[in-house]
């Protein structure tokens, strides 16, 4: 059985050594559930698919939700775990079994927390959003996600990262007239027309937005270009896929309108293919403010999209905070500094009390 009350570094290693690729989390969920039932007193514990949920009912004035996903990307020859000096190596070491270990250890060792606690260990975060276990819990058990602040244990190198950017993908398509390239004047080259789109992107200046002391830098980038029929054909169609990462003060609708404004006047068709709203940091809320104080005021904006957006949609302030370097997530040499693990335990113990 997992030892939740022992060394959280050893607990991290034990979690890493349980393979848990997305959709194959049954074993790790079984282990987590059994350990919580045996070692975390005062929690109501339930199972939802391959997700494990636990909560206290201490009638505290505020509730803190700790959320972590149990799944990892496919193993890349990086199991079992191994310790080298101050680094713990293995699949999921940073993303995010070290964060899970911190939450599990605290659940079993906090005697008198000053907040009520909810823990959500969920499945299928690393694959398509439609399969995400947190989304399923939101649909099937919405009362379990009620909280005054949520902490998602994604790797942040031990710094609190508030909110997250939104993301929007669109395809800009242009049309022309097909012709033999030997008689190019009879055609209208669609690929050439993309030049005007790329020119707009080349001179675009992304904005930076300060929200609750966090600076969110936006980005509007071409990520794919498609076109061409054959080596002797003037193409009659071409497209460029654009990804807009926008600050959380903009809605998806406002982000889409901004893209239309940027390319206004060009003869292009704009089709939205994917979008997810960002999450405001909400650091002015009392429960979130206390967390920032426990961290000594060290907080920064989160770049990229994470599940904190799901909490923001519910009106719950949410932050990312966990051990490990996010740049090492999904790498063959994924690892976490063991000092990050103990530091996260210490900080959250100060914040949660007990």
Swiss-Prot record:
Q: Which cofactor does it need?
A: Zn(2+); Co(2+)
Pathway membership = Amino-acid biosynthesis; L-lysine biosynthesis via DAP pathway; LL-2,6-diaminopimelate from (S)-tetrahydrodipicolinate (succinylase route): step 3/3
Cited PANTHER family = ACETYLORNITHINE DEACETYLASE, N-ACETYL-L-CITRULLINE DEACETYLASE
Query: What is the official name of this protein in its record?
Result: Putative succinyl-diaminopimelate desuccinylase DapE
Keyword set, alphabetical order: Amino-acid biosynthesis, Cobalt, Diaminopimelate biosynthesis, Hydrolase, Lysine biosynthesis, Metal-binding, Zinc
NCBIfam families for this protein: dapE-gram_pos (TIGR01900)
A Gene Ontology biological process in which this protein takes part is:
L-arginine biosynthetic process
Keyword field contains RNA-binding: no
Instruction: Quote the cofactor binding remark.
Output: Binds 2 Zn(2+) or Co(2+) ions per subunit.
Gene that encodes the chain: dapE
- Top EC class, one word: hydrolase
Q: Which residues participate in Zn(2+) 1 binding? A: 69, 95, 154
Name the Pfam families for this protein: M20_dimer, Peptidase_M20
